[in-house]
């Protein structure tokens, strides 16, 4: 348990939904959530060489919606946000001077972004038509999802899925063994 500055107990420092008063000026106080709505879980923050082009690609390939963009004095995107379905994703142009490096500079990325979508088949066709590289073709999986994996032109890897079936842990282990996979 943690003590708040007001003496109340918090059950966790994470997912704290308490509201905090912030004063904008002498006459007005705003009440804000410590964790903004829609950002309760992990939010990927992508470093991209060519962030403006990437935003346009994500709109075309994945149906992304741009929710904000801030350019720096040098014209590079200092911060932007998009949504793919309900998933919030932050991104910015690569800034080597602060060690914010893109997959292209690093020679790839070990991170895969996983997002559930309503129709993986439609998204896959749209992504491929927009120029995404298919890394794993769309297929039904033993764990109940239909999935596909793609690399964007900027070096980020995306794993999209549509959940098709609830599978118990025991059944999942049986199916994995039958498929020759790990349990």
Question: Where are these predicted regions, by residue range?
Answer:
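Local alpha-helix boundary/kink/capping signal
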Residues: 17-18, 50
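Vicinal oxygen chelate
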Residues: 23-49, 55-56, 62-151, 160-183
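C-terminal catalytic core of tyrosine-transesterase DNA break-rejoin enzymes
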Residues: 154
């Amino acid at each position: 348990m943690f003590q708040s500055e007001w003496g109340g107990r918090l059950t966790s420092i994470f997912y704290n939904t308490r509201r905090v008063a912030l004063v904008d000026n002498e006459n007005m106080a705003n009440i804000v959530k410590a964790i903004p709505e829609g950002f309760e879980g992990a939010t990927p923050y992508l470093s991209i060489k060519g962030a403006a082009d990437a935003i346009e690609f994500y709109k075309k390939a994945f149906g992304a919606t741009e929710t904000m963009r801030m350019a720096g004095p040098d014209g590079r995107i200092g911060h932007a946000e998009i949504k793919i379905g309900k998933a919030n994703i932050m991104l910015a142009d690569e800034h080597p001077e602060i060690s914010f490096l893109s997959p292209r500079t690093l020679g790839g990325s070990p991170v895969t972004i996983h997002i559930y979508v309503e129709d993986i088949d439609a998204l896959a066709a749209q992504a491929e038509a927009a120029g995404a590289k298919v890394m794993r073709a769309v297929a039904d999986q033993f764990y109940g999802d239909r999935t596909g994996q793609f690399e964007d032109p900027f070096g980020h890897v995306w794993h999209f899925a549509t959940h098709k079936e609830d599978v118990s842990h025991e059944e999942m282990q049986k199916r994995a063994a039958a498929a020759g996979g790990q349990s």
